[in-house]
Amino acid sequence: MTSNDGDRSNGDDDGRPHGDRAVLALAREDWRTAADAYVQAAFATFAGYEGFGYGAFGDRTEVGVAVAHLCRASVCHRLADATGRAQNRAAQGALVAADAREHVATERVDEGACEELVGVCRVLADDPDAATAAFDRARDAYADADVADPAGATTRPVHQAGTDLLTHLSRPDDVAWDDVHGTGGDALARRVRFLRSKLPEFVDARVRDGKLHAARASTEYNTGYRCPACDATDVNYHSPAVLCLRCSAVVEAR
């Protein structure tokens, strides 16, 4: 069987977690390998073999992380000119998020977070009408939940996974928590509005630029490191490597 987005990866994962291999593939701009690694990271996280080991179905569910990895895989497939596979990964993510809404979430506020992820996946699947409907359901779920501390609710596991995905897809523009949620008492409602208006722009920008940067981790500026690709001295510390904060090239392997 042949593929339209590059050679088949060789399966040599050198013992690293799949998520780490995805980061290294992003640094090499090897989008096919990054997509495959993110898919493997998604299902390993879902099963409880990666991440914090909680899996999808417990009280501290990591289902949001798994769906976010499928979304990252979708973007990488787009960068590899594999639109069909990109849509497939997004559709998988939407199914997982919808299942979590029905069978994992126990509070209305968490149902809203699952609906957000459905909306993100539908954006990536080129289905704007379904995305709009999902974001509407998320908005309504948050209104029904009427949580006392909307800003605090954004740290719940599925919400945090969604925030991490959004900030990742925003790079190199690097939107911050305040950009997404504001400083008032309507953090959840504002979050949905931000997703609805900005996510398609971020996805289009990544495809137009032909690059998905590594997510922002721990960063440091004006260091003794120097990027071999762009000469920058600002770095992004990831577990598999020190990366350039500006272009995501490997500055120092680990």
What are these regions (language model features)?
Residues 161-254:
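Cys/His-clustered metal-coordination modules, chiefly Zn-binding fingers
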Residues 1-58, 222, 227-230, 234-237, ...:
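Terminal disorder- and signal-encoded targeting elements
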Residues 14-150:
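Alpha-helical protein-protein interaction scaffolds
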Residues 57-61, 65, 81, 104-106, ...:
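Structural signature of alpha-solenoid helical repeat scaffolds
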